[in-house]
Amino acid sequence: MAVETIRLTELFEQARAAQTQDPPRKLAPDRHPNRDFFVADILEWALKDDRHSMEHPFFSLSKKPDHRVRHYEHNGIHVVAKPGADGMPTIWYKDILIYAVSQLVEALNQGRPVSRTIRLKAYDLLISTNRGTGGRAYDLLAAAFERLKGAVIQTDIRTNGFRQREGFNIIDHWKIIERSPATGLMAAIEMTLSEWLYNATIGREVLTLNRDYFRLDGGLERRLYEIARKHWGRQPKWTVSIDLLHKKSGSQATLKKFRELLKRAAGNDALPDYRIRYNHESDHAMFYTKDSAALARQIASLGTLGTDSGGTSEL
């Protein structure tokens, strides 16, 4: 007991002496506690896409430069997409937005502060979106940012309760903030999302995608997956008229050509999670789950896969 008392006394004296001396060196102050940008450095994240551009056509499905102004209207929703000098951004360029939105949503889930302005590593973006990492990949990435910045969208779709009445760029701004000393290729990028997309993100107006989405080569296949994922819900199948599917896809192909492309996509069976069956008699497409257990339950409850009950949509 005496030894313990002495030790406590010594500790007390040391603490009192420390108060009269210069304070010990600690961590340097946080000089930027409220940064005006978000660093996209999260390693594990789920693929997230805003549900509005999944339902309605905002992007070109062709890799060829597309300079047409797009006008879309459905059930009171209007979208006008005007290309910039380099043409409309393609659905492949949308991968940049999916990556950014996914990072932001995961940060929100972790309670981290977020911002419309995002800093990211070009290499991480290329790897995460299943792209190459050669010099040409970086050139294409720069071109993608330019088209996203150049395109102007006008829409009455509200995001997080707000309507943006004037036209807006898909991204407000982008710049290279660091280059590789060895290759001169861009290493770090800063971009600012439109308020419209940022509001959709912080409002959690997003859906989770299968990570194999980035492995889809065809623009129409990517678009078909988006549409199916948006309208799917938890039903094992979803049926839609070809006219409506053609409209929602944003495809510039004729309706006849679109049917051919749809049947080709059905034959390729590349879509994650879903299969497609075309019914030429009703001129409808049926998307049904690749989950055999869910499909078996649907067949048991309805008696046949071919019935439209419970899964037809004219949304």
Each PLM stretch: what is its role?
Residues 1-315:
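Charged, alpha-helix-forming regions
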